[in-house]
Structure formats: C-alpha cells, structure tokens
Amino acid sequence: MSNRAKSPALDAVVIGAGVTGIYQAFLINQAGMKVLGIEAGEDVGGTWYWNRYPGCRLDTESYAYGYFALKGIIPEWEWSENFASQPEMLRYVNRAADAMDVRKHYRFNTRVTAARYVENDRLWEVTLDNEEVVTCRFLISATGPLSASRMPDIKGIDSFKGESFHSSRWPTDAEGAPKGVDFTGKRVGVIGTGATGVQIIPIAAETAKELYVFQRTPNWCTPLGNSPMSKEKMDSLRNRYPTILEYVKSTDTAFPYHRDPRKGTDVSESERDAFFEELYRQPGYGIWLSGFRDLLLNKESNKFLADFVAKKIRQRVKDPVVAEKLIPKDHPFGAKRVPMETNYYETYNRDNVHLVDIREAPIQEVTPEGIKTADAAYDLDVIIYATGFDAVTGSLDRIDIRGKDNVRLIDAWAEGPSTYLGLQARGFPNFFTLVGPHNGSTFCNVGVCGGLQAEWVLRMISYMKDNGFTYSEPTQAAENRWTEEVYADFSRTLLAEANAWWVKTTTKPDGSVVRRTLVHVSGGPEYRKRCEQVAYNNYNGFELA
C-alpha cells in the first residue's frame, strides 16, 4: 500500500438526496469539508420524490419518522395526519432541505454510472452520466433500500397499447410534475399485492370501470388506522420531541413500540385473543412490533396471531373463496414487512374488483390489448406494475463500482453482501453504505435510523481527518465475524422462512440455491452499542492509514 495520498477535489461524494443523503451532505458541510451530492431526480425527496402513486403514505407514525423535526432542524413543522401522505412527506423533505440549505451541494438530474478506487492515490474517481469524472476521498451511498424498481420478465411487456408504468415511476407532465391518472370508465390491471399494491388498489377501485388484481402471493395486511392530527396532539408532541427521540431510539426498530415481555404460548386463549383484538384496533404497526416477544421466534406463538388475522380477513371479505386466496399460506405473520391498509379487504367486496390468482394461472404474456394468463385474456386500458424493487443492493448493482484490484462490487457480493457493521466492505476502502446491507438502518424506521447512522459516519470521517488518516477498510477478520453474526441472528428467526425483499436468493451454476439476508435484525440499540464500542476503541476492526 502506498504511503502517499493525492488530494482529491472533494472530501466526499454522497449518492442520493433522500432523507439520509441530504442529512449526510449537510453534516459533512457543517464540519467544514467539501461535499458533492448526486441525485438522479430533479430535486430532493428520495422515495418521496419517486413514489407518487395514489394512496402512497407513511406506514410509520409521522412524528416518529420526522427526524428533522425531532432534532430541531425544522421544529416548527406541523403534521396534518398521524400517517402522512406522500405529498406531505415531500413537502417535509423540501422544508428540511431549505433549512439545511443543502441543495447548493447537489447536482440534480444526474446519475453516477461508475466509481473506481485509485489505490495509489487513495481516492475515488466517480463518473457521472455526462461523462464528467469527480474525485473524492470518501464515497457514500445513500441510495435507499427500495429505490431500484423492478419490472417483471413477461413476454410482450412493451407491446401494450394502453398506459403502463411501474408504481415508482408514475406519469409526469411536460414539466416533470406528477399528473393524475384518471381511472374513470377504464379497465385497470394491477400486478402485485405488496405494500404498494395494497395502497393503490382501494383508490383505483373507486373510479375504475373494472379493476383486475393479479396476485401471485398474498401478504398479511392489517389496518393503518390513519386520522387527522389535531392541533392539541401536535402541540403536545412538539413539547416532547427530546423524550420521543430517546424513546424511539430505545426500541428495536425505532418505531414507537416495545414488545410485550410475555410469550404467546404462556397466555390463555381468551387473554391472547383479547390482546390481539386490542392490537388490531390500534393504529400502525403495534400488532407486528408490540405483540408477544416470541412472535418471530416461535412458530406456535406466531400461528396464534396468524390465525387471528386470517379470521379478520374472512370477516371482512364476503366471498369465502376470495378470502382464502387473500390469506397467506407460505409465510408466518410478520416474516415479511406487514402492509398497512385502508379498506383493502373491503375493496374485494365491490362488483368491479376481480382477484386473479396468477399462482394458479400464471401470466403468459402482455398483449397489445391487455394481459393473457394460462386460462383467460383480460382486455385493459391501464396496467400498473406494483412489482417492487431490487432491494437494498439493487441500486448499487446498477453502478459499476470497482474497488482494489479492479474488483466489482456486484461480483464481490454475488452470493450476498459481506460487510463490517453494514458500513464498509473489504476491498472497497473509504466507501460507506448508508441504509445498506447488514447495517442497523435498513430493518428500521429509516427516518430516524438513517439520521443516526449519518452522524456516526461523520464522526469516523472527522476522526480520520483529525488524525491524518486517508484510508479506511475493514479487516478480513472483522468483516467475517460481523457477516457471520448477521446471518446467524437472522437464521434464528421466522424471518428466514419468507421470500421477503430483505432476502437475496441466488441460483449458482450447479443449480444450488443460496439465500442470504440483506438486513441486520438484532435491533437498533444493540447495533448502535456495537458502533459506539468500535468508535470508542479508535475504530477497531478498520485498517486506518
């Protein structure tokens, strides 16, 4: 390793202008360092910029997600709903960007196409889509866990004559602003019943002539329970921001919930059902995150809650055949992120809504007229692909990132990511991944956990600059220990039994299948404790030079 380090034009490049990216850029600038942010969109917002479909909103309590308000960056901010809609969330991020004056550090309508680590100079060369190359000491990815949209591999997908689009690329007008898609009198098809589809479907059903929902795998969905935010509640929350922040930091996922200390198997059936009923009626993720402590550890305890929610689905959906198709049979309750819904199940009681089970009759092709399955053809005017994302690592896979010895990140992580603290990977010095694989912000309330992680990264970078270090890379031993621990912790939970977005599945040339978790599931407090220990011990586990 060379002992010299060439001075780059920038201290850091931050990829992404979502809630975590703009905060990281702000912190680096505040510390007196030169930073450039790169954002593919026209403005800040991240997920709230790209996802503008009808029904899009937070599944986190607004006040608990709003780190910029909790931290006093925009203390005057007032939420209008307990679970804010996408337009309100975009206004919130824009207001925070104004307060931090962060846009001057960004280039918008710009993509990073490649990044190459130059070993002799200890810097990154970052190539933009206009072929310009900028150099930086630290490269920081803040692209988000769900930003690389995924279209299904269906024959004829480009042949459709009507309107079609992925849910995260909703149509825009000539100026780039989102335009409403009028479903009135139209035959609409929605492919996918994950969190996005669950939000779109009830809205589309209100005006569509006919709505066809193409479902392969049902999800466990529970009521969001949204309501307006009263002035009295908003004033009370604002007065308690420091306390609220400390509380959410104390929970495993930074949502405002602690698990019940009891085991589901230790409670009588009547007491259990009364508890489930109470949780089901509460707004938000309480039923997932404040239930019995063994929900995701014990199959019997999990089945108690799954059976309860299945009973609710049967009560809400009038057609028993449809109800059964909407009840998951392939994964435990909560082994996938639970979609929060508003009148989702009641939507299937409408005469104009039709559930198409594509596990029984798979989609064969998209035709100019619509969708053809194994047993029917559906003429459509609009097709919405609510088909999700290449999660967590997908956005990085789409950038040609090359570390030491010209090794590509996508090759290094071919069978699953390997990291230290989920923040750096060996072979890719000075490259940080915020809300990335195996760190404490991804299986978490990103609004808070991403902000806390950005603060830690700033501390490490500042420590390096103060001590004359220009190089950081995990030791092989530290990376191996962390990665093995992440995989082991995940495998002990029922999360390992679902094909959720946080599991990467790879088929090897010999036909064998490798499943690797993309997330750290041991809880935010434990994760931050580990990170603090590393920092306190002069960033042990990292090679600094």
UniProtKB/Swiss-Prot annotation:
Cited Pfam families: Pyr_redox_2
Record's subunit section: Homodimer.
Induction cue: Induced by (+)-camphor and 2-oxo-delta(3)-4,5,5-trimethylcyclopentenylacetic acid.
Gene3D superfamilies xrefs: FAD/NAD(P)-binding domain
Top-level taxon in the UniProt lineage: Bacteria
Enzyme Commission number(s): 1.14.13.160
Family: Belongs to the FAD-binding monooxygenase family.
Pathway it works in: Terpene metabolism; (R)-camphor degradation
Cofactor note: Binds 1 FAD per subunit.
Residues bound to FAD: T20, E39, T47, W48, Y49, W50, D59, T60, Y65, V112, V446
Activity dependence on pH, as recorded: Optimum pH is 9.
Coiled coil region boundaries: none
GO term, biological process aspect, one: (+)-camphor catabolic process
Temperature dependence: Optimum temperature is 20 degrees Celsius.
Molecular function via GO: FAD binding; identical protein binding; monooxygenase activity; NADP binding; protein homodimerization activity
Effect of R337A: Loss of monooxygenase activity
Protein name per its UniProtKB record: 2-oxo-Delta(3)-4,5,5-trimethylcyclopentenylacetyl-CoA monooxygenase
Residues noted as binding NADP(+) in the record, renumbered to the chain: R57, L58, D59, T193, G194, A195, T196, G197, V198, Q199, R216, T217, W501
Keyword list, A-Z: FAD, Flavoprotein, Monooxygenase, NADP, Oxidoreductase, Plasmid
Function: Involved in the degradation of (+)-camphor. Catalyzes the lactonization of 2-oxo-delta(3)-4,5, 5-trimethylcyclopentenylacetyl-CoA (OT-CoA), a key intermediate in the metabolism of camphor. 2-Oxocyclopentyl ethyl acetate is also a good substrate, as is 2-oxocyclohexyl ethyl acetate and methyl-substituted cyclohexanones, but free acid is a poor substrate.
Species annotation: Pseudomonas putida
Cofactor dependency: FAD
Lineage, uppermost ranks: Bacteria, Pseudomonadati, Pseudomonadota, Gammaproteobacteria, Pseudomonadales
